[in-house]
UniProtKB/Swiss-Prot annotation:
One of its GO terms (molecular function) is structural constituent of ribosome. One of the primary rRNA binding proteins, it binds directly to 16S rRNA where it nucleates assembly of the body of the 30S subunit. With S5 and S12 plays an important role in translational accuracy. Coiled coil: none annotated. GO terms for cellular component: small ribosomal subunit. Residues 96-156 form the S4 RNA-binding domain. The lineage of its organism: Bacteria, Pseudomonadati, Pseudomonadota, Gammaproteobacteria, Enterobacterales. Part of the 30S ribosomal subunit. Contacts protein S5. The interaction surface between S4 and S5 is involved in control of translational fidelity. This is Small ribosomal subunit protein uS4. GO terms for biological process: ribosomal small subunit biogenesis; translation. Keywords: Ribonucleoprotein, Ribosomal protein, RNA-binding, rRNA-binding. The keyword Ribosomal protein applies. The keyword RNA-binding applies. InterPro entries: Ribosomal_uS4 (IPR022801), Ribosomal_uS4_bac-type (IPR005709), Ribosomal_uS4_CS (IPR018079), Ribosomal_uS4_N (IPR001912), S4_RNA-bd (IPR002942), S4_RNA-bd_sf (IPR036986). PANTHER family: 30S 40S RIBOSOMAL PROTEIN, SMALL RIBOSOMAL SUBUNIT PROTEIN US4M.
């Protein structure tokens, strides 16, 4: 699958939001002027149309999870067929991707790094190696680092960073054994209020 290979901080400036594409050792503000969009006229504040707002919100969420357009649209279609609120269903599907869960557990400092661990067969789900990042994790699933990868310095370093952050309440994390469990369904209040999923649903509903 194709992936974005350009400057990651440029994407954060484009969306005027920290997309957590870089390790969390330093704040995004110390790395770039996030309030200034990229380009010659990035400092200009433009009044966006309703469509432009919807498009920017979709791009922000898509880039946050590192997903290309076609796959993101497929998540929307799947979310719209589930019972309940389509916007919340979309967020749940994205949050329960294996690469995101590995990132949330702290095995990787970014979702991209978590994806690399999965591709390199360093991650198990219920004691079986899973090598595709889009794998949908279910409640009560156990996610762990395979034995041969537990000595990787980047995983150990990432876990040290994770210990300093607030732990997701929907996950249990066993640092010594490098494993965690997906405890419960993710509620809307669990996630950032900076995300406006309603704008995305409005965009796709046209």
């Amino acid at each position: 699958m194709a992936k974005y290979l350009g400057p990651k901080l440029k994407l954060c400036r484009r969306e005027n939001s920290d997309l957590f594409l870089k390790s969390g050792v330093r704040t995004i503000e110390s790395k770039c002027n996030i309030d200034q969009a990229p380009g010659q006229h990035g400092s200009r504040k433009l009044r966006l149309s309703e469509y432009a707002k919807q498009l920017r919100e979709k791009q922000k969420l898509r880039r946050l999870y590192g997903i290309l357009e076609k796959q993101f649209h497929n998540y929307y279609k799947k979310a719209s067929k589930l019972k309940g609120n389509t916007g919340q269903n979309l967020l749940f599907l994205l949050e329960s991707r294996l690469d995101n869960i590995v990132y949330r557990l702290g095995f990787g400092t970014t979702r991209l790094e978590a994806r690399q661990l999965i591709n390199h067969k360093s991650i198990c789900v219920n004691n079986k190696i899973v090598s595709f990042p889009s794998f949908q994790v279910s409640i009560d699933d156990k996610i762990s680092v395979v034995k041969k990868s537990k000595n990787q310095l980047r995983i150990k370093a990432s876990l040290e960073i994770m210990k300093q952050k607030e732990k997701p309440s929907w996950l249990s994390i066993d640092y010594p054994n490098m494993e965690g469990v997906f405890l419960r369904s993710i509620e809307r209040d669990d996630l950032s209020s900076d995300i406006n999923e309603h704008l995305i649903i409005e965009l796709y509903s046209k």
